[in-house]
C-alpha cells in the first residue's frame, strides 16, 4: 500500500501577528506588509518608503 503524505491546512484570513517579531498589536496590513508599527518604522527605508516631513 502506498504512503499518503498529508499536507497542513492552508490558513485563510488575517495573519496572527508581525512576521518579523510576532507582536500582536499595531499591525500594518496595508500593501500586504503584516508588520507591527515598530518594525515598520525600523525597516521602512529598506522597503522603499520615504519620509517627506
Curated annotation (Swiss-Prot):
| Free-text remark on how the cofactor is bound | Binds 1 zinc ion per subunit.
UniProt-listed GO biological process terms: cytoplasmic translation
Cellular component, GO annotation? cytosolic small ribosomal subunit
Q: Which InterPro entries match?
A: Ribosomal_uS14 (IPR001209), Ribosomal_uS14_arc (IPR023676), Ribosomal_uS14_CS (IPR018271), RIbosomal_uS14_euk_arc (IPR039744), Ribosomal_uS14_sf (IPR043140)
Query: What Gene3D superfamilies does this protein's entry cite?
Result: 30s Ribosomal Protein S14, Chain N (4.10.830.10)
Q: Which domain of life is it from?
A: Archaea
PROSITE patterns found in the cross-reference section: RIBOSOMAL_S14
Q: Which UniProt keywords apply?
A: Metal-binding, Ribonucleoprotein, Ribosomal protein, RNA-binding, rRNA-binding, Zinc
Q: Residues that bind Zn(2+), according to the entry?
A: 18, 21, 36, 39
GO MF annotation terms:
rRNA binding; structural constituent of ribosome; zinc ion binding
**Which cofactors are required for activity?**
Zn(2+)
Function recorded in the entry: Binds 16S rRNA, required for the assembly of 30S particles.
The record's comment on protein family reads:
Belongs to the universal ribosomal protein uS14 family. Zinc-binding uS14 subfamily.
How the protein assembles, per its UniProt entry? Answer: Part of the 30S ribosomal subunit.
* HAMAP family given in the database record: Ribosomal_uS14_2_A
Q: What protein name is recorded for this chain?
A: Small ribosomal subunit protein uS14
